[in-house]
Amino acid sequence: MLQLEQEFNDEVYSIVREQAGRLRLGISQKRACFFLPAVLAEYEAMWPEIDLVVRDGNLFDLNKMLKNGELDLLVLNRTPETEAMETELLFQEELLLAVPVRHPLNEKSVYDPDSRYRRLSPEVLNGETLILHTPFQSTRKIEDQILSTYKVTPGRIRVIRSIETSVQMVAEGLGITFVREGYTRNFHYSKPVNYYTLDIEHHKRDVIVAYKKGDSLPEYMRAMVELLKTHGENLLNNK
């Protein structure tokens, strides 16, 4: 009996110190596969007593889970819809243009002293074959906005859901595609592509962590946020 009482008191003490609990983390399947494993390994070494539950899936479902209180934290790209949540910036990434190595557009790129990438004007996409994503993917909304804003008329549009497949099609000379910078870090294909930034406003995109409006994060959740920030920056800087 005394042993049970001691265990109960120890658990209560841990909760008070915010060192025991559960963390339910949501993240898209695509971002999870190359970004999350290293974060989880470091977090569980730091907080072994936390019940860490990961939900990877599509952002439509994950957003609903966050609103319904089924998630504590959600990693996603900043959109107008995220204004209804508490958010913190994790890192910023470029929206890149992937171009075949032997494509004439490579000759039209210009040096950008403030970037690791050379730059292309969106107008050069007129008449080109573009590989766009499906309408329900967040990247497609950005693609459509760019084409509309800069009055780009593609010669042909291919629609592919898989980001890896899109980039591999570019490598084979089948078109040009848009891709988030973070996604390119773990692409492995026998043929290379060239990546460029676009000479547009807001060419960098915010990757954020969101949680319910009005919530304050306990220490063990705050630790996860800081790890996500660190590993995000390391990913983009090839560390």
Predicted feature residues:
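Beta-alpha-beta core module
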Residues: 83-89, 93, 117, 164-213
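Short beta-strand-centered segments that line the small-molecule binding cleft or hinge
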Residues: 15, 38-42, 59-101, 106-109, ...
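Secondary-structure junction motif
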Residues: 105-107, 111-150, 217-225, 232-236
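Central regulatory/effector-binding core of bacterial HTH transcription factors
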Residues: 20-83, 151, 159-160
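A late-sequence structural motif
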Residues: 35, 194-238
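Alpha-helical "hinge/linker" immediately C-terminal to small N-terminal DNA-binding modules
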Residues: 1-20, 229-233
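Short, well-ordered beta-strand segments
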Residues: 22-26, 74, 131, 177, ...
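Hydrophobic hinge/microswitch elements
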Residues: 58-62, 67-70, 76-77, 138-194
